[in-house]
Every structure is written in C-alpha cells, then in structure tokens.
Swiss-Prot record:
Keyword match Translocase: no
Highest taxon listed in the record's lineage: Eukaryota
Assembly, per entry: Interacts with LEPR. Interacts with RAB13.
Transmembrane segments annotated in the record for this chain: 7-27, 32-52, 69-89, 100-120
Lineage: Eukaryota, Metazoa, Chordata, Craniata, Vertebrata
The protein's role, per its UniProt record: Negatively regulates leptin receptor (LEPR) cell surface expression, and thus decreases response to leptin. Negatively regulates growth hormone (GH) receptor cell surface expression in liver. May play a role in liver resistance to GH during periods of reduced nutrient availability.
Keywords: Endosome, Golgi apparatus, Membrane, Transmembrane, Transmembrane helix
GO biological process assignments: late endosome to vacuole transport via multivesicular body sorting pathway; negative regulation of growth hormone receptor signaling pathway; negative regulation of protein localization to cell surface; negative regulation of receptor signaling pathway via JAK-STAT
Induction of synthesis: Down-regulated by insulin.
Identification of the protein by name: Leptin receptor gene-related protein
Length: 131
C-alpha cells in the first residue's frame, strides 16, 4: 500500500509542476509557448541514468566512471532546463513572470523525477525496473 501512496503523491506533484509550466505559457499576460521546450529536458534527463544502470554490472562498487559520467550528463541537462527560460526572458522572448512560473515548474518536476527514483529504485517487487 505504501507504493500506491507514493505513486499518487508523485502523480500529484507532477501535475502541479506541469500546471506551473502551462500557466507560464498560457496566461493572457504571457501567451508565448516557447517555454514548453523544457518538456524535452524532462524526457531526456533520466536517459543517462538508464544507460549507466544497464552498462554498469558491478553494483557493489562505490563509484564507477560510467555512473559518474551519467551523473555529469544528467546535471548538465537539469542545469540547461533551468537556464533555458532565463535566457528566453533575458532576450525578451518571454516575460520574467512566465520565467518564474517555468522555473517553479522545473523545480517541482525534477524533484518529482528524483522522488520517483528514490521510491521505486530499490529493486523490490513494485519498481520501475519492471517497466
């Protein structure tokens, strides 16, 4: 039952993050849909971790070069997702209020992604490895 509660909480927080993102795009004062490109960063952020998990066979090691490289690429993707709306606001493509909403959505979504891996990455019966 704890897995179901965690899944519901993660779904709720993901919906809140996407709501912030949509508000940053669709409010009448903002009305520009360029910030939706951060959805690409949401999709590609866990890919380096998945690849490193498949390639790394020694799970007992405290560190491996492949895993560290995956963390580096994931960090670059996350920083790019936070930098993209700031750059759009700096060149006046979007307004700073929309940038704030997108940054709030980014924080919620990336914390949701991290929470997903913390909750379901244990390797028990109900985990993301089955998906």
């Amino acid at each position: 039952m704890a897995g179901v509660k965690a899944l519901v909480a993660l779904s709720f927080s993901g919906a809140i993050g996407l709501t912030f993102l949509m508000l940053g795009c669709a409010l009448e004062d903002y009305g520009v849909y360029w910030p939706l490109f951060v959805l690409i960063f949401y999709v590609i952020s866990p890919i380096p971790y998945f690849i490193a998990k498949r390639v790394t066979y020694d799970s007992d090691a405290t560190s491996s070069a492949c895993r560290e490289l995956a963390y580096f690429f994931t960090t670059g993707i996350v920083v790019s997702a936070f930098g993209f709306p700031v750059i759009l606001a700096r060149v006046a493509v979007i307004k700073w209020g929309a940038c704030g909403l997108v940054l709030a959505g980014n924080a919620v979504i990336f914390l949701t992604i991290q929470g997903f891996f913390l909750v379901f990455g244990r390797g028990d019966d109900f985990s993301w490895e089955q998906w």
